[in-house]
Every structure is written in structure tokens, then in C-alpha cells.
Amino acid sequence: SLHPAGHVLGSAQVRMEYDGAVWVASGDYKLQPDPTCAPFEPVRCDTFITESTFGLPIYRWQAPQEVYDDINQWWRRNAAEGRASVLFCYAFGKAQRILAGLDAGIGPIICHGAAQALTQVYRESGVALPATVMVSDVMDKAALKTAMVIAPPSAAGSPWMKRFGDYSDAFASGWMLLRGARRRRGVDRGFVLSDHADWPGLKQAITATQA
């Protein structure tokens, strides 16, 4: 049977039973609240096969709302200075989770095509997200100076980015907890937000299975 993993929309753990023994393979999961997908469901089992992307004690996440507040503050400051805010993140899951936490009153929200297509799937699945547009739909180019731009990491340094002029950029990932990872990305800001469980989350999930 399949059980919600809380990773992204539609993510699931797999429960298998044979000769009275129950095994669960988690796949990717997180325990933090996320309005864009069903929450992680602990499943009692004898053996739990867990992911461990961030399986070290240094990985401990902030409350998501604190991260959203930081992102909105960064966007608001950039908009006041007439600079677009370009936030690089994974197009599936992370982009939609960030969208759900944005203050759409600050300015327009532009999605790269890779994120826009998936965002529409989320909307069709009943997930409430703020209005987003493609950059090609923006008629008033002055609006770009106050925009939040959601783009996949692959867009960095591409010709697509040139239309935003003097922008400030950031990357949202659990890896941004590491100074070296922030430096290698070469962005102005790093926001620590992950769709994977942190160290306390991994321990909590494992304990909850009673494996």
C-alpha cells in the first residue's frame, strides 16, 4: 500500500507485507508542515528503509515561516531598490512550496516555464497558490524591477536571465546551511529550505514507525 511521504505533491512511502513481516520504504520525506502536499504518515513496521539525505546532526531546519519571512523581506528590499529578485529552486515541489509562502502584495511573481507548468498541475490538484505569469506575458517591463522570479538552477547564467537586468539572486535548498555550498553557487543569498527531513526529523520518523 502507498502512504503519504510529505516530500512533494503525490510522494508516497511503500508498505510491503509478506509472511507476517511488514517493511516500509520511505523514499524522500519530510516532517515539516507544507500546505502543498499531504503530510508524512508514520506507518508501523518491522523494518523501515529510510532516506538520509541530511543524515548528520548539523542539519537542523528553521521553522518554514521564518524562512518565508526572510525571503519576503529580501524581496521587499530589492523591490524598493528597483531590482528583480531571482530565487533559484527545484521546479517540482520546492518552487510551489515557496510560492505558497510568498507575500504576493510585494510585486508580480514570474515563473520560469519549467516551474510554471508544474505549478499549474498543483493548482489543478486543488493547491492554493498565488497568481504567477511567464516573463513573456509581462507587457510593462518596468514591472520586472519589483518582480519575484522563480527559476530552476539550470537557468543561472542563461540568456533567459538577461532580461531582468540588475537583479539580486538567491538559492533555496537545505544545502545552503553549508557556507561552501553557498559560495559555490555564487548567489547573493542562501535560504535554508528543504523538502527532506533534517536530523531531528529523521530520528522522529524512525521512532514513530516502531521498527
Describe the role of every protein-language-model region:
Residues 1-38, 80, 136-165, 178-182, ...:
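Core dinuclear metal-dependent hydrolase active-site scaffold
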Residues 1-88, 93, 100:
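His/Asp/Glu-rich metal-coordinating catalytic cores
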Residues 8, 27-29, 52-54, 90-92, ...:
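Active-site metal-binding loops of divalent metal-dependent hydrolases
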Residues 34-36, 58-60, 117-127, 179-182:
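Short, charged, surface-exposed secondary-structure boundary motifs
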Residues 64-68, 131-133, 149-153, 170-174, ...:
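A general structural motif
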Residues 68-85, 89-145, 150:
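Hard-cation-handling environments
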Residues 164-207:
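A C-terminal functional module that forms or caps the active site or interfaces directly
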